[in-house]
């Protein structure tokens, strides 16, 4: 099944147009190689890490690599480019040491994203364990403001996207209201938007599976975050049940959310401007191509 998906994706990759559908890819061999591979599997947008997501230190982007990436994107029409922040960053940590390391690391993330010409940088707000949610919100906003202070983001087509979380205890961003509050605090100080994750939304307790549930959930999105603020959807099926708070991604159509929910989302004109990017497992060769191909099929059908 995976081999068939790769073959079909490669046949159609050069002709991909319109809807921005992609996947998170490795940058092994060079970030521009990820762009080339994205096209091979039928994607016209992608997400990457700009450095190892499990280390605090990272090298700066080499100008030659940034230029190769720029040319590859222009030639292959791949965009937007989304960079995901390291998992270590916690901008609302109660620990002064962790928070300061997070501010420094996040500043590096912004610098690398700008150097790469990325349109979006996705950030998990973090954990406010040991504090109130309000204190966590204040710290998160202050930390982000400190991290970007003095950086030339005003001259770029660039936004920091706050991602909703799975709703685990002390996790900031588990509800649309929390995401909206953080965005509102940041609007005057940073270029911000939102990334919504289907798996996180589902396990946090929102219904996106049934038609009526989807309508109610999107009503809440409109009333809190606003549709235009959602720049990216992370398209991930879920291994766990709605409301479980367990962030376990599954292949599109093989989890508790199901293919029909993704078809409904991809056809929702309120998100016609957004990019749709999978962060699905790679259990065997060809899984990336298979998930991209299924999302394209659901959009076409």
Predicted feature locations:
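Conserved, mostly hydrophobic/aromatic
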Residues: 38, 84, 102, 113, ...
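Residue-level preference for long, well-ordered alpha-helices that form the structural scaffold
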Residues: 58, 62-65, 95-98, 102, ...
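Histidine-acidic metal/acid-base catalytic patches
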Residues: 2-5, 10, 180-301
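Aromatic/hydrophobic pocket-lining residues that form the small-molecule binding cavity
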Residues: 31, 66, 102, 106, ...
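Active-site beta-loop-alpha junctions enriched in small/polar residues
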Residues: 24-28, 51-53, 86-88, 126-128, ...
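Acidic (Asp/Glu)-rich catalytic clusters
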Residues: 12-16, 36-43, 61-82, 109-117, ...
């Amino acid at each position: 099944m995976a081999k068939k998906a790769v073959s079909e994706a490669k046949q159609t990759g050069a002709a991909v147009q319109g809807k921005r559908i992609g996947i998170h890819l490795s940058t092994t061999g060079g970030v521009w190689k990820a762009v080339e591979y994205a096209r091979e599997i039928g994607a016209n947008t992608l997400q990457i890490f700009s450095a190892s997501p499990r280390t605090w230190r990272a090298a700066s982007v080499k100008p030659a690599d940034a230029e190769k990436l720029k040319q590859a994107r222009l030639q292959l029409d791949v965009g937007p480019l989304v960079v995901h922040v390291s998992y270590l960053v916690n901008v609302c940590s109660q620990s002064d040491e962790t928070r300061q390391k997070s501010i420094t690391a996040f500043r590096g993330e912004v610098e690398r994203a700008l150097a790469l010409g990325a349109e979006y940088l996705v950030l998990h707000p973090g954990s406010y364990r040991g504090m109130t949610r309000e204190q966590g919100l204040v710290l998160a906003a202050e930390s982000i403001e400190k991290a970007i202070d003095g950086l030339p983001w005003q001259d770029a087509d660039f936004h920091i996207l706050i991602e909703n979380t799975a709703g685990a205890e002390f996790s900031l961003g588990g509800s649309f209201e929390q995401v909206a509050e953080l965005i509102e605090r940041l609007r005057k100080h940073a270029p911000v938007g939102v990334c919504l994750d289907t798996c996180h939304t589902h396990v946090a307790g929102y219904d996106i599976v049934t038609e009526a549930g989807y309508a109610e959930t999107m009503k809440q999105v409109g009333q809190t975050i606003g549709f235009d603020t959602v720049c990216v959807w992370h398209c991930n099926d879920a291994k766990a049940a709605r409301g479980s708070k367990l962030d376990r991604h599954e292949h599109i159509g093989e989890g508790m959310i199901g293919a029909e929910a993704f078809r409904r989302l991809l056809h929702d004109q309120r998100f016609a401007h957004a990019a749709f990017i999978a962060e699905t497992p790679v259990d065997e060769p060809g899984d990336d191509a298979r998930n991209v191909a299924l999302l394209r099929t659901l959009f076409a059908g």
